[in-house]
Amino acid sequence: PPSRRNAIYAVYTFSRRADDAVDSVEELQATPEEAGAKLEQLRALLRGEAPSDPLAPAIEDTIERFGVPLEHFEELIRGMEMDLHNQRYQTFEELYRYCYRAAAAVGLLCIEIFGYQGDPSEHAEALGVAMQLTNILRDISEDLTRGRIYLPLEDLDRFGYSPEELERNELN
């Protein structure tokens, strides 16, 4: 239905803006401070403090029509902030928190729009985290060029493998 489609467009656009803010730093088109300001603009949009933003009416309608919790939007923003400030994760728990925020939060937003019976939030979270972990594994080389290592450092250490070996693409 058009209302659900428009709500998904709004969530996608919000998510894209958050991700683009971080990507702009990685592409040297913005400073971390400028990217942080863009994320704060998204927070202002959620608070209803950005009425001139063309996305504002769509986000407001999505939240009101489908009862989408603001917390899921906020978690997504926090995930993007983690990307701005963290280049590496020490533990899987830290990485899981990032995956939850960067990906599972989007799934949790979407299930509110799709509608459901029962409580699929556990499955939406697991799917979002699994998709983000898959993305991390797929992009290991690309992330290394950006100085990022998403693989938990404690796991590298546990298997006798160093970040330096990973950066040199050494296999052992």
Task: Name each model feature, range by range.
Residues 1-172:
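Acidic catalytic motifs of isoprenoid enzymes
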